[in-house]
Amino acid sequence: NLIQFGNMIQCANKGSRPSLDYADYGCYCGWGGSGTPVDELDRCCQVHDNCYEQAGKKGCFPKLTLYSWKCTGNVPTCNSKPGCKSFVCACDAAAAKCFAKAPYKKENYNIDTKKRCK
């Protein structure tokens, strides 16, 4: 679920940036998404959005699905049984790892999406 996703982000980025910093970033980080991603981090969010969309098509509710995972050496690892829990966990873990690798550009936080996300 979204709280677990926030915790995964903290795991992967070693707590270096609050999870909420990603909630209003670029064109895809946060609710909804459209246009061309503004950078690598925003692309991580676009991929995550697409993953959640696929989960929804499988009958899952990714924002609410509780799953089992652990943080080992700043790597989020899923240990849920196959099905919605495993699928959603994999979406979140991949995004958290992607976030940890991508540079965070302050100028892409809280942008005017109407102008920049076409």
UniProtKB/Swiss-Prot annotation:
SMART domains: PA2c. GO terms for cellular component: extracellular region. It comes from the Eukaryota. Its cofactor is Ca(2+). Keywords: Calcium, Disulfide bond, Hydrolase, Lipid degradation, Lipid metabolism, Metal-binding, Secreted. Disulfide bonds join C11-C71, C27-C117, C29-C45, C44-C98, C51-C91, C60-C84, C78-C89. It is an enzyme of class 3 (hydrolase). It is found in: Secreted. Ca(2+) binds at Y28, G30, G32, D49. Gene3D superfamilies: Phospholipase A2 domain (1.20.90.10). GO terms for molecular function: calcium ion binding; calcium-dependent phospholipase A2 activity; phospholipid binding. It catalyses: a 1,2-diacyl-sn-glycero-3-phosphocholine + H2O = a 1-acyl-sn-glycero-3-phosphocholine + a fatty acid + H(+). PLA2 catalyzes the calcium-dependent hydrolysis of the 2-acyl groups in 3-sn-phosphoglycerides. PANTHER family: PHOSPHOLIPASE A2 (PTHR11716:SF51), PHOSPHOLIPASE A2 FAMILY MEMBER (PTHR11716). Belongs to the phospholipase A2 family. Group I subfamily. D49 sub-subfamily. This is Basic phospholipase A2 PA-11. It comes from Pseudechis australis.
